[in-house]
UniProtKB/Swiss-Prot annotation:
Gene name of the encoded protein: rpsJ
Recorded family membership: Belongs to the universal ribosomal protein uS10 family.
NCBIfam families (alphabetical): PRK00596.1, rpsJ_bact
Species name: Mycoplasmopsis pulmonis (strain UAB CTIP)
Subunit architecture: Part of the 30S ribosomal subunit.
Domain of life: Bacteria
Gene Ontology BP term (one): translation
GO function terms (MF aspect): structural constituent of ribosome; tRNA binding
PANTHER family listed in its UniProt record: 30S RIBOSOMAL PROTEIN S10 FAMILY MEMBER (PTHR11700)
InterPro entries hit by this protein: Ribosomal_uS10 (IPR001848), Ribosomal_uS10_dom (IPR027486), Ribosomal_uS10_dom_sf (IPR036838)
Function comment: Involved in the binding of tRNA to the ribosomes.
Signal peptide positions (record): none
Protein name in UniProt: Small ribosomal subunit protein uS10
Amino acid sequence: MKKEKLAMKFKSFDHKLVDDAVKKVLILASKEKIDYSGPIPLPTKREIFTILRSVHVNKKSREQFERRTYKRFIVFNNPGPKFVEILKRTEMPAGVEVEFKVK
């Protein structure tokens, strides 16, 4: 019997949204009795943008903004086509990007 794995990666700028989406998927997995490993928190990507406050003069006066990307990773063992179809139809919170990979 060939073992199939489904890897899901969640990304968002808000860590609460990522955690809600992961929780929703894990509830579905426990209802369908699917074995999984995770959620594994992946490193947070931090981007800093520096812009001038004034358009004209005052080069030393600058403002910095930060954007963080939070990521989580889950692997499902032998998910089955029914579970994959349920996941595809599941609505995730707005602002969460979900990536599927079947191995």
